[in-house]
Amino acid sequence: MKKMTINDLIKWKQEGRKFATSTAYDASFAQLFESQEMPVLLVGDSLGMVLQGENDTLPVTVDDIVYHTRCVRAGSPNCLLMADMPFMSYATPEQACENAAKLMRAGANMVKIEGGDWLVDTVKMLTERAVPVCAHLGLTPQSVNIFGGYKIQGRDQEKADRMVKDALALQEAGAQIVLLECVPAELAERITKVLDVPVIGIGAGNVTDGQILVMHDMFGISANYMPKFSKNFLAETGDMRKAVAKYIEDVANGVFPDDAHTIA
C-alpha cells in the first residue's frame, strides 16, 4: 500500500469513492489492516473500554494514546494515522498544541478532537502549527455525562442545524476531516454534501465519504453489547483477513452499512 495522505481522501471524495477505516491499538492488528490496504486507522480513546475494561473513555490519558500510536505506526507505516486527544487534553488551544505535539511525535498524521464550534480557536492554532485535525461531532463519547448516556444526536431540527453550522465552522477553521457519530442518516447526508472535506461516519448511514468501526466490534470480540450500527464481519467470513477485506469491499460498494445498521 502506498503512503496515504489527506489529499488522497479529498480526491476520493471528489470522485465519489467511499473508503473504510478502523480503530487499531497494536502493531499486529495494524499490520493486518495494512495488508488489506486499510487507508486510515484511528488510535481511539475507545481503548479505555475495549482494552482497559473501563466503563467509558474518560480515564484514558495522553500517555496511553502516545504508547498505542507508536505501536500502530510500527505495524502500519503507510496508513493515514489519526490519534484521539483524550478527555480534558485540549481544554485550551495551548494545552491542545502541547499534547498534540506528543501524538504527532509518536507517529500520528492527524489528531481527533470532540466538540462543536467552541473548538474553532483550537483547530486554528493546531492547523497553523502544522497539526492536521479531525473534528468529531454528534455523539461525542467524552461528553457522556453531559448527554446522560450514549444517545443519538441531531434528531430535532434546531440541533441538526447547529451541527451543520458547527461542521462548517470547523472546516473553515482548518479541520481536514469531520467524523459524525450516531446521527440520523439524513443529517449525515446533509453535512457530507455541504462540506468540501471528507466525512467519516459511524452510526450515520452509508452516505458519508468513509465509514469507521471499532476493531473489536468488527471481529465480534467486544466485551460489552454490540451497537446497532456495528457488524461482526468475522462471523460472516471465519477469517480475520477476509473479515477486513469484506468490510473494506462492502463500504466501497455502498453495501455497508445497510438499513439494519443505520440509525433512522
Swiss-Prot record:
Molecular function GO labels: 3-methyl-2-oxobutanoate hydroxymethyltransferase activity; magnesium ion binding
Name this protein carries in UniProt: 3-methyl-2-oxobutanoate hydroxymethyltransferase
Residues binding Mg(2+): 45, 84, 114
A Pfam family assignment: Pantoate_transf
Any Gene Ontology biological process: pantothenate biosynthetic process
State whether it acts alone or in a complex, and with which partners, per the record. Answer: Homodecamer; pentamer of dimers.
Cytoplasm among keywords: yes
UniProt-listed Gene3D superfamilies: Phosphoenolpyruvate-binding domains
In which organism is this protein found?
Vibrio parahaemolyticus serotype O3:K6 (strain RIMD 2210633)
**What is the E.C. number?**
2.1.2.11
Reactions catalysed, semicolon-separated, are: 3-methyl-2-oxobutanoate + (6R)-5,10-methylene-5,6,7,8-tetrahydrofolate + H2O = 2-dehydropantoate + (6S)-5,6,7,8-tetrahydrofolate
Q: In which pathway does it act?
A: Cofactor biosynthesis; (R)-pantothenate biosynthesis; (R)-pantoate from 3-methyl-2-oxobutanoate: step 1/2
Specify the superkingdom: Bacteria
Cofactor remark: Binds 1 Mg(2+) ion per subunit.
Per the entry, what this protein does is: Catalyzes the reversible reaction in which hydroxymethyl group from 5,10-methylenetetrahydrofolate is transferred onto alpha-ketoisovalerate to form ketopantoate.
A GO CC term attached to the entry: cytoplasm
Give the record's family classification: Belongs to the PanB family.
UniProt-annotated catalytic positions: 181 (proton acceptor)
Keyword tags: Cytoplasm, Magnesium, Metal-binding, Pantothenate biosynthesis, Transferase
* Classification via NCBIfam families: panB, PRK00311.1
Per the entry, which co-factors are needed?
Mg(2+)
Q: Where does 3-methyl-2-oxobutanoate bind?
A: 45-46, 84, 112
Subcellular location field: Cytoplasm
